[in-house]
Each structure stands twice: as C-alpha cells, then as structure tokens.
Amino acid sequence: MTDVPVSRIRNFSIIAHIDHGKSTLADRLLQDTGTVQQRQMKEQFLDNMDLERERGITIKLQAARMNYTAKDGEKYVLNLIDTPGHVDFSYEVSRSLAACEGALLVVDSSQGVEAQTLANVYLALDNNLEIIPILNKIDLPGSEPERVANEIEEVVGLDCSNIIKASAKAGIGIDEILESIVHLVPPPQDTVDQPLRALIFDSYYDAYRGVIVYFRVMDGQVKKGDRVRLMASGKEYEIDELGILSPNQIPIDSLHAGEVGYFAAAIKTVEDARVGDTITLAEKPAKEPLPGYTEANPMVFCGLFPTDADQYEDLREALEKLKLNDAALSYEPETSTAMGFGFRCGFLGLLHMEIVQERLEREYNLDLITTAPSVVYRVTTVDGEVTEIDNPSLLPPPQKREKIEEPYIQVEMITPETYVGTLMELCQSRRGVFKDMRYFTLSRTAVVYELPLAEVVTDFFDQLKSRSRGYASMEYHLIGYRENPLVKLDILVNGDSVDALAMIVHRDKAYYVGRALTEKLKELIPRHQFKVPIQAAIGSKVIASEHIPALRKDVLAKCYGGDISRKKKLLQKQAKGKKRMKSIGTVDVPQEAFMAVLKLDPQ
C-alpha cells in the first residue's frame, strides 16, 4: 500500500455542473477499482452531509485513493480529489485543482455546457491541468452526444475527436475513463529530495482528534512524528497521525511528493489550517510557500435572530460549532431594538448563506428570523477615513460622508437563445451594465453583465431560473468597488426607526422601494387603538408614508338621545386617551414584516 514510485501516481479531479453526474461517476470509479466494497456502497458515497445528498450538491471536499491495475499490467495509484461545483465555493475549487495534474470534464449529454462548468474549466486551465472530456448519461433517451461534443469544442476549445461516451449510472465507459486517466494525466514531478512543501486543500473538525487536514505533498516527504509549520499562520504542530484516504482513513508512516493524504496534529480550529496554506517542516522549512493562497472573505452579510429569546445561547453554540468546520463563516453579536439579541453573520455568497441557515435549523433545531442580506460597502468620510460597513444601520449620517462605494460583480449567464431578451431585461432592471454576448451554438448564448452585488443578493438567482424556466445557469466573480449615489432608507413605525428594516439603496430606486415597503407593512402590521403612521425616510426627509387607521370603540353607545354636550364630553375624553396612548403606546411589528423586505419585487 505504501511505497509507490512517483511515475505511477495520478492525481485528478472531476469538474461538472450540478446534476451532471459527478458524484455518481465518483461512486462508480470507487466501485470498479475495488476501493469500496459492494456492500458498503451507497449513492453519492463521497457526499457525507445529508444536506449534500438532498440538494445533490457537493459542499465540502472529499478525497479518495484508488489502486488500479491497468491493461498493460502495471499497478497505479489514482487520487481523486473531489471539488464543490458551486460558484460560492470557487476558491476551494481552485485549491483542489492546484493539487491535481488532470481533470475529468463531465458534461451531461442531454444538457450541454453550463456556466459553472465553464468557470471551473478556466480555473483548471489556469493551473495547467490536462483536461479529459467525458459525455455522461448517454443512455438517456434525450441524449445528443454529437451536438454536445461540438459545443464543448466551440465553447471550451478542447479537441473532442476521441471524447469518451459514458453513463456512470449504467456503468458504460468506466474502463475507458480509468485507462485515459492513466495514459493522459501526467504523473507528478519527482521532487522527493527537496524541502517539504504540501498544499492543504481541505480540513474539517473532528471532536476527538482536533482538525483533520487533507493535503497533497508537492515536494519532499513527511513522516509521522514530524514537526510541521503552516506557512501562512506561522504555527507549528507535531503530526500525531498520518494516513491516506481510501476514502476511509488508513494510517501509514510516511508520504512523499505526489501523494495525497491526511494528518491530525491536535489543531484547535479550522482557521489555523486554512485551505491553500503550505505545510513545511519546522527544522528545514522551504524558502517560499506554494503560490495562490488567499483568505476567503465573506461577501454577503445578514442578521440571524432566534424567534425565541431563550435560544440565543443555543444559537451561539451552534455557530461556534459550524465555525469549527467552516473558516469562511464569520459572526459577531448584534442587538436590534426590533428583534432583540442575535448575530451578524458573513458568508461567501447566497448558497453558502442558505446552507448555513438550513444547517442551523436542521442540525441544531433552531427557529430563526433573518434580516435582508446586505453587502460590504466602502464609505469615505469627510475626514478622508475609509471604513467598511456590512450593516446599513451603522452608516454615518449624510453630512459626515463623502462617498459610498459598492462591490460589483461580473455575471456570466449561459442560456437558450429564446430567453436572452427577458434575462437582459432582468439585468437592466438591476442596474446592470451590458458587457458582452457570445453565441456558442444555435441554441446556446452567453450573456455577460456587470452588476452591483447588492442587486444580486436578494432573489436574482430565483428570477433567473423562473424567467428561463430553469434552463439558464450563471457564474459570477468580484471585479472591484465603484462609487454610486447610494442612500440609507429608514423605515419609521409610529415615529420610531426600525433598525432591522433599514437598507442601503440607489437614490433613483429609493422612492419605489420606500413606497412598496410602506404599502406592504400596512398590510402586515395589525391595527391598534390609535392611528399608526408608517414612513420611509432618507435622513430627515420622508419620501413615502402610509397610515394604519385606529380601531375605534363606540363610546356613545350608552347615550340614548340626550344632550349633545354629554356626547362631546365623552368624545373629548376618548380623544385625550388616544393621544396619551399614542405617545406611550408601542407598536408590535410582526415577524412577517421582516420577511417582507426579502420578498419585495425590485422591479
């Protein structure tokens, strides 16, 4: 099991869009090489989380080592490094691709090339990987292998003359795939004699052993008991356990250049072993780390509040536990006058946010309210000081700020031609700037727009899917900050500002958003004994307002006929009471009102 010459090692990953059959293909490879016994096999073997199985997406990376005897009689070791296919996790993808020499590009032969596939192929090309194209699901009645092969040639620029036609489900073409990995993917470089450098491509927290780090040895070799240093954090650890993933962990004594494995060294949190960091020996460190390490910064923020104030501690514990496994998640305590105690959390993107929320509710039985997601704004004050703000209620007043800049992203959508018009309309309505349009084949078009991230975080993805009947796919990346005339929109209920409803919007849209929001709140807030004004304001200027009429008790019911002055006296007494009630009464804002912000139609 242990000593394998470097020339017989093949490291590869699988690139595919959601639902194009990546996990099924991985299962089939594990089965055909005898890595996983038939009786232990279950669907999507490498997707460990229930949520991953349910949504059919891969969130955390996995890795597996397979022993394969090729047709030429030689024994090879194949290391499959799984990648998450979703755009929020593109940094993780780039690191796991950096740990490989080749990639299988799996495309559904009934669907064609999708945006995320394309984004990941570009990452693979940046890392100089050998790409092997595979058409999957060719046993389906709707499969069109010729059309899709042409599409791959045109869009990606790969030679598809000897493309592999396969069906992971039916087990067609699996031997061909294994042979092509052996013959086409180059072996790792033989650099066993150099100082140790290894790339971390994933890590997760284990309650008994601390953080388990998955890594690929690039140069040199590492043994159990070695003292290693992580170059980005500068911390040193002693390796207690070293092993290979097959896919279950099998401890061994040493690993050398080209091999993939795991180690445990009593590391406390995942933050200490960041993805992309370089491992080297403490005694003989390498001169410089491997290139490409960056810290994953959260892009989207929202407030999470427990519906029941007693669950605050539970929420904090749950976030702490999730944080152990998710270095990209950030959170800090926050108090809101409307919602009480909670946390302001930062995420990589929308999918990441949804998954964290769903895991909190599902794995920790919490009932949560979320505020509208916001992005990180860059504010320059009059004194020339630049601060980053992720919460609209922290924005300095207009007279103290000089400019607000917001993050912009470049969105690439791949869609059937019929839906191009409606998707362009969607982007225009979100302040998008048209950049480029490319026709791939007769039926597929790529449309490129630059958009403010704030316009995409609420429901852009849902709109994209509903307008294109689910056929369009998108991929985005950050392109920098730009200055825009942005204002803070406050919502006042009965004269008091409700901090959880505050938002930062573009000046041209402020009136429409304010109008829509006040109308929505008028429906949702119950009537009180006194008249309740709802206002949308920018600074001290009210731009839209609605009133909830008072419930009126009939105080004259007991006066039959009788004297007008008697009736006047009762009415004046009622008016006085209402006035007093209005000055000291509080208005309950129901939870649906906070959700209303998320459901506003930005049109």
Curated annotation (Swiss-Prot):
One of its GO terms (cellular component) is plasma membrane. This is Elongation factor 4. It comes from the Bacteria. It catalyses: GTP + H2O = GDP + phosphate + H(+). InterPro entries: EF-4, EFG_III/V, EFG_V-like, EFTu-like_2, G_TR_CS, GUFP, LepA_C_sf, LepA_CTD. It comes from Rippkaea orientalis (strain PCC 8801 / RF-1) (Cyanothece sp. (strain PCC 8801)). One of its GO terms (biological process) is translation. HAMAP family: GUFP, LepA. GO terms for molecular function: GTP binding; GTPase activity; ribosome binding. GTP binds at D19, H20, G21, K22, S23, T24, N136, K137, I138, D139. It is an enzyme of class 3 (hydrolase). Transmembrane segments: none annotated.
